C-alpha cells in the first residue's frame, strides 16, 4: 500500500481517475488476506481457525473475472460462500474482498488527509478526546444555548455512492462498492432497506464508511455555513481517520439574501462551538435566541437537501444551559453560577467585591449507572447488591480483579465531577456484590468471606485512590481539594458504560417523540 500511496502522491490524476485497475492486482488481495488473518487471530484463538482460511489465488482470479464482466445480477460474494453478507458468520472470502475494497477506497482519502494536515496548523483544528472535557470547561460556561444534534446513521446506498463521486472520478471503481451496499441493503436481516452506518460495527469497511460519512457531513456543513455567512473562523478541516475533534467559529455576520444591500443582521460577538464525541455532536452557541433557531433550522434543511434525509425535529433539540441539562459524554452537563469572593486593596483601604462567574458542573448520573449495573446482574432495580453467578466459575483473584477494574473505571471516569458522593453508593454495591459472588462460589456467607479477605477486598483500587489524593492534596488544602476536579488521561479506554448510558438516553428520547 505504500507503493500505491507513493504513486498517488506523485500523480494526483492517477489517484483520482484510475483506481479501478487496483482491483485486478493479486497483491492487493494478499495484503487484505494478511490483514484479515491478523485481525481474526487477535480476536479468536489459533486453534479455532479452520483449514479453509487460506488464500487461493484461483478464487481471487475468478472474483476478478466477475468484476470484469460488470454483471450486477451476480452477487459478488455468492460464489465464495453460500452464506449472505449480512449473516453473522461471514465467509472468509467476503471479508477478504471487503478488505481489498476498503484498501482501494482508503488510498485517495489518506493522501488527501495527509496533504490537508501538512498545509494547515493541525493543533487549531483537531483535538483528541483528552481535550474534550477541558474544552467543555472553557467554552460551555460562556455559552447560553446548546444544540444537541445527533448524526443520522441511516442513509440510502445510492446517496452514499454519489457522495463518493465527489472524491473519486473513476466511476467503475465504485461498482464493487455499489454491489456490496445493495447486497447489504437487500439482506433479510435489514428491515429498514437502508445502510445503517454506525461506528460500533467492528469491521474496517464499516468503520471507513462511518469516518467518510461524518467527514462529508461536517465538511459540507461548515463550508456552506461559511459561504452563507461572513465569518472569521479558525482554520479547520475534516479527517476521515479521526473521530474526535472540535471546531470554533466566531464573529459571524449573516447577510440577508433578499435585501443584501439594505438589511444586514449583525450579531454582537456571537460564538459557535462545535464538539463531537463519537456520533453525538454538540453545538454551543452564545447569542440571541433567534440565532439558535436559525442554526437548528439550518441543520434540518441541510440534511434534507444534501443527503435527502428527513430528520425528525427531536434529533436536533435546543435548550438553555442555565435551565436544562445536556447528557454527553456520560455526564449530565449544566452551567451553574459560582460566586467568588475577591479582596482588593487600594490606597491602604480594603475593598471587598463579590464576583459571580459561570462554570460547567458535570453531574454523575447515579440512577442510570445503577440501572446499568442491574442490567449486568450486579444488583436489582432498586440497587440491592446480588451475586454475579456467571463469574462463580472463575478464580478468586479473577473475581477480585474484575470488580476492582469496574470500580477503578467508574472512579476515574467520573472524577471530573465536583459531587462524587453518589459514587460511594456504587462502591457499596460493587463491594457487596463481590462478597456475595465469592460467598456463592465457596458456599459460605458474606461474614466469612469478609473475615477471610479483610482488607484484600478492593484493596488495589481503594488504596491507590487514597494514596493518590493524599499525595496530591496536603492537609492545608483539604477544603480546596473538594472543589477541584481531575480528568484522567485514560478515559478513552474506560467509556463503554458512558456509551451504553448515552444509547439508552437516545432511545428514551426517540420513544418519547414516537408516542
Swiss-Prot record:
Pfam families: Intron_maturas2, MatK_N. PANTHER family: MATURASE K. Usually encoded in the trnK tRNA gene intron. Probably assists in splicing its own and other chloroplast group II introns. The keyword Disulfide bond does not apply. Keywords: Chloroplast, mRNA processing, Plastid, RNA-binding, tRNA processing. GO terms for cellular component: chloroplast. HAMAP family: MatK. InterPro entries: Domain_X, Maturase_MatK, Maturase_MatK_N. Belongs to the intron maturase 2 family. MatK subfamily. This is Maturase K. It is found in: Plastid, Chloroplast. Its main location: plastid. The lineage of its organism: Eukaryota, Viridiplantae, Streptophyta, Embryophyta, Tracheophyta. GO terms for biological process: mRNA processing; RNA splicing; tRNA processing. The keyword tRNA processing applies. GO terms for molecular function: RNA binding.
Amino acid at each position: 500500500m505504500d507503493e500505491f500511496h507513493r504513486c498517488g502522491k506523485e500523480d494526483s490524476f492517477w489517484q483520482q481517475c484510475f483506481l479501478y485497475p487496483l482491483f485486478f492486482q493479486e497483491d492487493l488481495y494478499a495484503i487484505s488476506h494478511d490483514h484479515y488473518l491478523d485481525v481474526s487471530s487477535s480476536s479468536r484463538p489459533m486453534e479455532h481457525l479452520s483449514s479453509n482460511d487460506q488464500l487461493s489465488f484461483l478464487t481471487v482470479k475468478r472474483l476478478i473475472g466477475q468484476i470484469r464482466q460488470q454483471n450486477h445480477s451476480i452477487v459478488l460474494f455468492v460464489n465464495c460462500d453460500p452464506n449472505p453478507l449480512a449473516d453473522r458468520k461471514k465467509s472468509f472470502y467476503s471479508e477478504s474482498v471487503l478488505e481489498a475494497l476498503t484498501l482501494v477506497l482508503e488510498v485517495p482519502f489518506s493522501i488527501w488527509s495527509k496533504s490537508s494536515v501538512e498545509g494547515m496548523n493541525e493543533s487549531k483544528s483537531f483535538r483528541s478526546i483528552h481535550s474534550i472535557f477541558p474544552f467543555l470547561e472553557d467554552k460551555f460556561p460562556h455559552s447560553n444555548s446548546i444544540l444537541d444534534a445527533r448524526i443520522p446513521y441511516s442513509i440510502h446506498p445510492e446517496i452514499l455512492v454519489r457522495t463518493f463521486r465527489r472524491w473519486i472520478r473513476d466511476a467503475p471503481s465504485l461498482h464493487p462498492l455499489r454491489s456490496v451496499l445493495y447486497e447489504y441493503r437487500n439482506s433479510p436481516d435489514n428491515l429498514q432497506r437502508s445502510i445503517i452506518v454506525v461506528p460500533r460495527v467492528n469491521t474496517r469497511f464499516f468503520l471507513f464508511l462511518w469516518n467518510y460519512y461524518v467527514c462529508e457531513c461536517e465538511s459540507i456543513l461548515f463550508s456552506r455555513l461559511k459561504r452563507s455567512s461572513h465569518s472569521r473562523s479558525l482554520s479547520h478541516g475534516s479527517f476521515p481517520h479521526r473521530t474526535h475533534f472540535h471546531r470554533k467559529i466566531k464573529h459571524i455576520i449573516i447577510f440577508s439574501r433578499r435585501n443584501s444591500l439594505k438589511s444586514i443582521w449583525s450579531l454582537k460577538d456571537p460564538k459557535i462551538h462545535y464538539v463531537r464525541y463519537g456520533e453525538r455532536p454538540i453545538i454551543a452557541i452564545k447569542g440571541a435566541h433567534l440565532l439558535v433557531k436559525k442554526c437548528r433550522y439550518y441543520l434540518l434543511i441541510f440534511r434534507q437537501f444534501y443527503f435527502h434525509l428527513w430528520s425528525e425535529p427531536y434529533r436536533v433539540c435546543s435548550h438553555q444551559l442555565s435551565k436544562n441539562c445536556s447528557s454527553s459524554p456520560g455526564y449530565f452537563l449544566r452551567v451553574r453560577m459560582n460566586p467568588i469572593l475577591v479582596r482588593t486593596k487600594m490606597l491602604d483601604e480594603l475593598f471587598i467585591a463579590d464576583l459571580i462567574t459561570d462554570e460547567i458542573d458535570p453531574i454523575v448520573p447515579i440512577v442510570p449507572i445503577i440501572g446499568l449495573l442491574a442490567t449486568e446482574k450486579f444488583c436489582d432495580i432498586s440497587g440491592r447488591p446480588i451475586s454475579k453467578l456467571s463469574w462463580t466459575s472463575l478464580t478468586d483473584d479473577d473475581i477480585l480483579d474484575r470488580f476492582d477494574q469496574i470500580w477503578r473505571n467508574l472512579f476515574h471516569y467520573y472524577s471530573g465531577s465536583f459531587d462524587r458522593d453518589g459514587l460511594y453508593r456504587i462502591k457499596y454495591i460493587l463491594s457487596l456484590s463481590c462478597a456475595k459472588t465469592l460467598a456463592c462460589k465457596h458456599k459460605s456467607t458474606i461474614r466469612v468471606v469478609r473475615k477471610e479477605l479483610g482488607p484484600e477486598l478492593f484493596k488495589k483500587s481503594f488504596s491507590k485512590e487514597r494514596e493518590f489524593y493524599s499525595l496530591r492534596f496536603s492537609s492545608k488544602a483539604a477544603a480546596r481539594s473538594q472543589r477541584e476536579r481531575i480528568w484522567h488521561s485514560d478515559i478513552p479506554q474506560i467509556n463503554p458504560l458512558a456509551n451504553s448510558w448515552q444509547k439508552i438516553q437516545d432511545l428514551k428520547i426517540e420513544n418519547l417523540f414516537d408516542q
